[in-house]
């Protein structure tokens, strides 16, 4: 692989061009990795600001008008409101689980039905979350589970 960087002070936006014989899985992974830098999210913890990638986030929760980001190892606070995260991360596999939470589908280990049409998610951290009946259908649809599968 050959990498060339051209610096141009008149450039307004970073542009990356890939020259290859054929677009294969390795190229697609590189593109996905590059795009993830554009979707970096900031969170604060102990007075420090951290850069978080969507793949590292298990879920985002709103508590007392504050927004918290949960990863496998830490909890961060972030200024955007929950609906802003939902809109921004929808293409990254995030979905609304309740009025107060947005979950990363990649962070879900398993799910099972619960009373009243709700779902219980087990996250990769072992933590359990409830998907309200209002949003359970959307989750099933994202997973390709139609009808009475669950």
Q: What residue spans do the PLM features occupy?
A:
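N-terminal regulatory/sensing modules of transcriptional regulators
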Residues: 1-26
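A broadly conserved detector of short glycine/acidic/proline-rich loop/turn motifs that flank catalytic sites
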Residues: 7-9, 22, 47, 82, ...
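Short, structured patches in soluble enzyme cores that scaffold and shape functional sites
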Residues: 20-22, 125, 133
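Conserved binding/recognition cores within well-folded domains
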Residues: 26-124, 128-130, 150
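Solvent-exposed, charged/polar functional surfaces in cytosolic regulatory/catalytic domains
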Residues: 88, 138, 142
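C-terminal structural segments of small proteins and small subunits
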Residues: 131-133, 137-138
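Short, charged, intrinsically disordered terminal tails
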Residues: 141-150
